[in-house]
Amino acid sequence: LNDDLRLALRLADSADAITMEHFRSATLAVRAKADATPVSEADEAVERIIRETLARERPDDGVVGEELGADARGSRRWIIDPIDATSNYIRAIPVFATLIALEHEVGVVSAPALGRRWWASRGDGAFCNGNRIRVSPIASLDDAHLLYDSVKDFDPFGTSERFLALARRTKRTRAFGDFWSHMLVAEGAAEIAIEPSVALWDLAALQVIVEEAGGRFTDLHGDARADGGSAISSNGLLHDAALEAFR
């Protein structure tokens, strides 16, 4: 493991301790942000401890976080989502994770309530709980599993019918959503995951892991980026077919 990945894994350990301490707590404090999405005291505590550690150990690096904003230090940026799927977390649904990325180079997704952690560093492959992972070899939509969050997420973009047309061509669909959809693609359990509206901190860690697992990761325009506002991850073999459905 390189030093940056080792650090990211330690950051994930700290995050897991906080999220599991507050998980299923009857006294968890939750409020609505300006965009009406929820944030809990655990989200803020996780991001604070990660930022404090990075300030000590990588003082020249910048940090972008969902809850506490961005700073412009350095050419390297750490991208943090303290709790991806906060809505699950506050309802005691165990599908949530802390996402930590050194932009383009390192990705860690830690889902302690699921007992799973995925990680990758550029050029070194992708892993889940220490086992190497690889995308599936399925090359036909007829045999593919397609994952997403919610059909209504496509409504503001006028693409719901296009998504449904693609879904009907696949073998099976599941609305797992958030990080888990993309990690299941990286593991080879599914072939395509699609999200029409997501932020950089939702995607930066996922992109590294999916690509290091042999998959392909783009926005809905086909650009290989985590800051395009949307995402398709795939096993690579079915990526063009998924993109074509939205054109």
Each model region followed by its residue ranges:
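Generic detector of well-ordered alpha-helical packing
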Residues: 44, 48, 67, 82-85, ...
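N-terminal subdomain of lithium-sensitive/metallo-dependent phosphomonoesterases centered on the IMPase/IPPase/PAP
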Residues: 1-83, 238-244
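Residue-level signal for inorganic ion chemistry
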Residues: 19-22, 43, 54, 86, ...
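DPxDG-like acidic metal-binding loop motif
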Residues: 73-127
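Small-residue (primarily alanine) positions within well-ordered alpha-helices
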Residues: 8, 12-15, 107, 206, ...
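Solvent-exposed alpha-helices and their adjacent loops that cap or buttress functional pockets
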Residues: 31, 70-72, 91, 119, ...
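An extended, acidic
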Residues: 134-247
